[in-house]
C-alpha cells in the first residue's frame, strides 16, 4: 500500500527518483503515468491520457491554479504565442504554488518537458484537468479516497466490521486465473476431482495463514509472486492485474486471516458453499452461572467459588481508599507512586480498622487502581469488587476446571490485553463476543490452542466482566484464571456474604430475611 501513497504524491516527490530505465518501464501504467516525466521516458503519454489522467480529480488549490493556467496557455497557443512566451508564463505560474519544493519541481518539469506539455495542451484544450493530472498537480480522486480509507483504519483501534464478500471476493476470484491461465478463449475449465481440489485449496489457505503469522516477509513475497503471475495474462491484462493486486492485496490478506479456510475456498469456487451456522443464543447472566461452562477434564469434586459481599467495615475501608486514590490520580501521580502510598493510607484510619484496611490493600489495592484508571465512576468501584452491597453487580457462581499452576493465567492476560488495545470503551457484548472469537488468531502460535480452550471454558463469565472493565490482571484474577496471592475476605456470618448466598434457595433467603429481595432482583 505504500506504493499508492508514493503514486499519489505531488510533483516534488515524483522528481526525487532517478531517470527511469528499461526495467522500470516494464512495470506498467502504475509507473508510466506518475507524471509527464515518467510517461515521456517510457513512451506512454498517449496511453496515460486515455486510461489514467482522464479520471476524476480532487479539488485543491494547486489543481485549480493549474487548470486556469492550462486554459490560458491554450488561448495563447490559439493567438500564435511563441514557446518562449508560454514557458515564461508557466514558470511564473509555478511561483504561485503554496510550497517551495512544489514550486521548484514545477519549474524543473516545465523546463525539461515543455514540448511534450504543449503537445498535450494542444490535444486536450477542452479538458485542462487531464493536463494537470499529467503534471501531477491534480490528484486522482480514486487514489485520494483509497488513502483516506487506509488512514482511517490506521487511526482507529476498533476491529473493523467489513463485508467479507465485497472486499475479498474480487481479489480471490482472480486467483484461479492467475495460477491456471487459460490457453485460449475456447478452453474449458478443468473438472473437480471428487473433492480433492477442495482439500488442496483448504490445505493451501491453511499453510498461507500459518506463514503470515510466523514469517514477517511472507506477505510481501506472496504479493510479488502473484504480480509475476500477472505477466502470463498478456500485455493488456498484465498491467490491470498488477494494479489491482497493489490496490487490494493488503486488505484481502487481512480479511483472509479472519475467515476459515473452507469459507475462502468456497468463495472462489473450489469447495461447495459453506452453510451458515446460527450463532448460539447468549444466556442471561443469572442463568450463565449454572452449568454452561464445560469442564475440559475429569477432576476431583469441584468447590463452588463465590464472590461474597463484604461487611460494612470492609465497605467503608474500600470507599475511603477509593477517595484517596482518586485524589492522587487527579494530582497526576504515577501508578507506582499510588501503589507505594497505599500503606500510608491505612495509617490515617483508627487502629481498630488498620487490620481490615491492610487486608483490603493487599487483596484489592491494584484492582482498585486499575478500575479507577479505566475511568469507572468511583461510586461503583467497591460494588464491582463486592466489598459493598446494594447496587453492586450480581455475584457470579461458576464451576470451572482448575488449571494446574494457573495454566490459563498467561494466555488470559494476553487475550484481555489484546481486547483492551483493540476495543473502544463502552463496547457492547456483541462486539466483545466478536473480538473474543477473533482474538486467539492474533496471538503467537504457542498460545493459540490454549487460548481457544480458555475462551470455550470462560466465555460467558468473561463477557460479563469485560463489559465493565478490561484490565488484564484484574479480569484474570476475578474469573479465577490467575491464582490470588491472598485469600478473599470473608465475613463471620454467612448472611453478610450478600445475595450470592441469600438467594441460593428459599431456605437461605428466609434465614437471612431476604425473600422479597431475591424475588425482585434474582429469581424473577
Curated annotation (Swiss-Prot):
Locations listed in the record: Lysosome
Effect of residue 240 to C: Strongly decreases stimulation of cerebroside sulfate hydrolysis
SUPFAM superfamilies: Saposin (SSF47862)
GO molecular function: enzyme activator activity; ganglioside GM1 binding; ganglioside GM2 binding; ganglioside GM3 binding; ganglioside GP1c binding; ganglioside GT1b binding; identical protein binding; phospholipid binding
Effect of residue 453 to P: In PARK24; associated with disease susceptibility; affects the intracellular trafficking, resulting in endoplasmic reticulum retention; cells carrying this variant show accumulation of autophagic vacuoles, impaired autophagic flux and alpha-synuclein/SNCA aggregation
GO cellular component, one term: extracellular region
Pfam families linked: SapA, SapB_1, SapB_2
Task of the protein: Saposin-A and saposin-C stimulate the hydrolysis of glucosylceramide by beta-glucosylceramidase (EC 3.2.1.45) and galactosylceramide by beta-galactosylceramidase (EC 3.2.1.46). Saposin-C apparently acts by combining with the enzyme and acidic lipid to form an activated complex, rather than by solubilizing the substrate. Saposin-B stimulates the hydrolysis of galacto-cerebroside sulfate by arylsulfatase A (EC 3.1.6.8), GM1 gangliosides by beta-galactosidase (EC 3.2.1.23) and globotriaosylceramide by alpha-galactosidase A (EC 3.2.1.22). Saposin-B forms a solubilizing complex with the substrates of the sphingolipid hydrolases.
Subunit structure, as described in the record: Saposin-B is a homodimer. Prosaposin exists as a roughly half-half mixture of monomers and disulfide-linked dimers. Monomeric prosaposin interacts (via C-terminus) with sortilin/SORT1, the interaction is required for targeting to lysosomes. Interacts with GRN; facilitates lysosomal delivery of progranulin from the extracellular space and the biosynthetic pathway.
Associated pathology: Combined saposin deficiency: An autosomal recessive storage disorder characterized by hepatosplenomegaly and severe neurologic disease, due to absence of all saposins. PSAPD has a fatal outcome in infancy.
Name of this chain's protein: Prosaposin
Source species of the chain: Homo sapiens
Source lineage: Eukaryota, Metazoa, Chordata, Craniata, Vertebrata
Amino acid at each position: 500500500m505504500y506504493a499508492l501513497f508514493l503514486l499519489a504524491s505531488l510533483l516534488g516527490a515524483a522528481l526525487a527518483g532517478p531517470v527511469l530505465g528499461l526495467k522500470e518501464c516494464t512495470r506498467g501504467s502504475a509507473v508510466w503515468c506518475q507524471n509527464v516525466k515518467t510517461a515521456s521516458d517510457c513512451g506512454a503519454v498517449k496511453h496515460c491520457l486515455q486510461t489514467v489522467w482522464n479520471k476524476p480529480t480532487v479539488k485543491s488549490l494547486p489543481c485549480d491554479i493549474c487548470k486556469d493556467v492550462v486554459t490560458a496557455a491554450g488561448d495563447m497557443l490559439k493567438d500564435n504565442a511563441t514557446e518562449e512566451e508560454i514557458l515564461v508564463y508557466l514558470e511564473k505560474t509555478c511561483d504561485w504554488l503554496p510550497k517551495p519544493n512544489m514550486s521548484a519541481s514545477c519549474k524543473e518539469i516545465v523546463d525539461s518537458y515543455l514540448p511534450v506539455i504543449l503537445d498535450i495542451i494542444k490535444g486536450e484544450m477542452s479538458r485542462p484537468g487531464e493536463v494537470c493530472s499529467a503534471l501531477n498537480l491534480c490528484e486522482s480522486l480514486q487514489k485520494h479516497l483509497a488513502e483516506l480509507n487506509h488512514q482511517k483504519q490506521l487511526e482507529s483501534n476498533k476491529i473493523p466490521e467489513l463485508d467479507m464478500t465485497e472486499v475479498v471476493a474480487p481479489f480471490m476470484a482472480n486467483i484461479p486465473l492467475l495460477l491456471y491461465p487459460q490457453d485460449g478463449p475456447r478452453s474449458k475449465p478443468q473438472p473437480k476431482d471428487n473433492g480433492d481440489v477442495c482439500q488442496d485449496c483448504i490445505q493451501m489457505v491453511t499453510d498461507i495463514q500459518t506463514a503470515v503469522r510466523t514469517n514477517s516477509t511472507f506477505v510481501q513475497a506472496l504479493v510479488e509472486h502473484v504480480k509475476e503471475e500477472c505477466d502470463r495474462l498478456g500485455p493488456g491484462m498484465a498491467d490491470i492485474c498488477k494494479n489491482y493486486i497493489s490496490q487490494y492485496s493488503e486488505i484481502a490478506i487481512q480479511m483472509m486471516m479472519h475467515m476459515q479456510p473452507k469459507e475462502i475456498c468456497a468463495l472462489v469456487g473450489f469447495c461447495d458453499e459453506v452453510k451458515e451456522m446460527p450463532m448460539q443464543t447468549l444466556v442471561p447472566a443469572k442463568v450463565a452461572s449454572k452449568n454452561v461452562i464445560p469442564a475440559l477434564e475429569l477432576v476431583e469434586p469441584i468447590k463452588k467459588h463465590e464472590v461474597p459481599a463484604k461487611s460494612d467495615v470492609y465497605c467503608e475501608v474500600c470507599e475511603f481508599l477509593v477517595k484517596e486514590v482518586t485524589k492522587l490520580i487527579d494530582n497526576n501521580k504515577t501508578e507506582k507512586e499510588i501503589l507505594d502510598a497505599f500503606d500510608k493510607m491505612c495509617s490515617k484510619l483508627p487502629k481498630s480498622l488498620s487490620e481490615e484496611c491492610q487486608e483490603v490493600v493487599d487483596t484489592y489495592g491494584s484492582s482498585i487502581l486499575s478500575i479507577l484508571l479505566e475511568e469507572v465512576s468511583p461510586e461503583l468501584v467497591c460494588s464491582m469488587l463486592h466489598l459493598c452491597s446494594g447496587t453492586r453487580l450480581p455475584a457470579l457462581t461458576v464451576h470451572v476446571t482448575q488449571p494446574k499452576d494457573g495454566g490459563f493465567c498467561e494466555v488470559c492476560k494476553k487475550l484481555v490485553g489484546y481486547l483492551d488495545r483493540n476495543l473502544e470503551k463502552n463496547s457492547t457484548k456483541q462486539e466483545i463476543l466478536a473480538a473474543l472469537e477473533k482474538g486467539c488468531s492474533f496471538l503467537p502460535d504457542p498460545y493459540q490452542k490454549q487460548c481457544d480452550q480458555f475462551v470455550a471454558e470462560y466465555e460467558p463469565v468473561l463477557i460479563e466482566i469485560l463489559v465493565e472493565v478490561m484490565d488484564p490482571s484484574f479480569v484474570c484474577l476475578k474469573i479465577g484464571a490467575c491464582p490470588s496471592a491472598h485469600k478473599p475476605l470473608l465475613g463471620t456470618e454467612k448472611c453478610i456474604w450478600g445475595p450470592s448466598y441469600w438467594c441460593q434457595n428459599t431456605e437461605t433467603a428466609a434465614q437471612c430475611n431476604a425473600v422479597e429481595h431475591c424475588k425482585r432482583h434474582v429469581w424473577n
